[in-house]
Amino acid sequence: MTPSDICPAIELPSSSRCMRIDYVGHPDAFSSCSNLCPTNLLRCIYSVRKYVLVRALSNFEDNTMFCTLRRSKDANKSYAIHMDDPPFARTKGRLSAIACVDCRASKTRCTGEPEGCKRCTFRKRPCQYPNLRRSNTTQHGEQIEASSSTFTMSDEQGSLGMEVSGQGSLDAQDINFANELTPVETAATMSDTMMSSECVTLNDSTITSSTIPFSIDSDIDLWNDVTGMAGSDTTSLWDYNAGSNDNIAAISTKEYVCACFAQALKTYESAEVHLVWSGRAHTADIMGLLQQQKNTISDCERLLDCVQCIEKSAFVVLLISICGKVLRSVEDASRELRPRDSVTEPTTKSKDPSQACLNIDANSISRHQLDDDDRLVVLGSLFLNRVTKLRSLIAAIEMLVMKRNWHIQRDMVRQLKSRVRLIDT
């Protein structure tokens, strides 16, 4: 055969390590490189690709061979062609990457023949392969069966019964979950605080309003209301009225949302009502005022610990306003607690919002009877303690706004500090 009978080499895809050469004739006619093509061509092909795909075009059949070019031991021939399997082909019936039980136990390399590996055949031992696929399928089936097993919802008093109207109590196996409900393993237990009745009634895949959603107390305060919507760690229920299983979500904990802003609003409301307007209405007592000031300052200190909310300007402004409410009540009380000269004091004086603070019950301070001077000393020390705590709180807020370069908030804090200095003098 002459080189003119050989078509130009056509490269296979870049992912393969082969080149293809089409020629006319029968593949058995070429047993060496001299019968195929010149040595220079073979060297060029061998330098580019490791394998050569030889396609024999005949009148009867289309045969394809994969050959490996190797150096020939014959001195007269540079290369020889050896028939080989395609590099991307896998031996049919071979259990690749699966060793027999005996080779696994001895930790030796297994050839993996289906009828028996060479090691077991040589030693005349039974060769068995582990059925990994079957075991995985079996485990998957067991998981599916476990997921559809019986689940019970129980509270602290006992198990939570599930009844279908008109049929009495049913087991989990009798309930058809395929159409409406998807059993969830995480719904094994529920707290009694989440349920308003002792049992859940299923009537045509619907839940009555007396059980779900949960009943909410009518006089619930702002803090509980907001934390119930955002920030609560209670689990959410799936929708029993959904028509398909895709819309029924598993019970999962809601993503936590910080509720410090709601707590700050509640603290602001409490300070406005009990520290400002109660004094104007002459309904505040001195001990209640001191306790309210202490609680308000403690709430603000806890709110400053939230690393997320202190980055919000509105949150910091709200805390500054709360400090202003506390400072105002301290200023009013401090004016009343100062010693007065009965001669120089005017006979008529406009009533201050905190004048009712001096209506003190001796038993509220001590069981022993105290005169007016002792009462002023005790109350003065308590108010001085409130001023000290308030000064520390304002200093912490000042560092916060200075670090973030909030100029307006800085001026507000400095105004509060100047008012605190006036109380000390």
UniProtKB/Swiss-Prot annotation:
Q: Which UniProt key words apply to this protein?
A: DNA-binding, Metal-binding, Nucleus, Transcription, Transcription regulation, Zinc
Q: Which GO terms describe its molecular function?
A: DNA binding; DNA-binding transcription factor activity, RNA polymerase II-specific; zinc ion binding
Query: Which residues mediate DNA binding here?
Result: 100-127
One Gene Ontology term from the biological process aspect of the record = aflatoxin biosynthetic process
Entries under InterPro entries matching the protein: AflR (IPR013700), Zn2-C6_fun-type_DNA-bd_sf (IPR036864), Zn2Cys6_DnaBD (IPR001138)
Please give the superkingdom of this protein's source: Eukaryota
Q: Does the keyword Transport apply?
A: no
Q: Which GO terms describe its cellular component?
A: nucleus
Record field: compositional bias (Polar residues): 133-157
Report the transmembrane regions from the record: none
Q: Which stretches does the entry tag as region Disordered? A: 132-159
Q: Where in the cell is it found?
A: Nucleus
Give the protein's biological function. Transcription factor involved in regulation of gene cluster that mediates the biosynthesis of aphidicolin.
Name of protein:
Aspyridones cluster regulator
Native species: Neocamarosporium betae
Q: Which gene encodes it?
A: TF
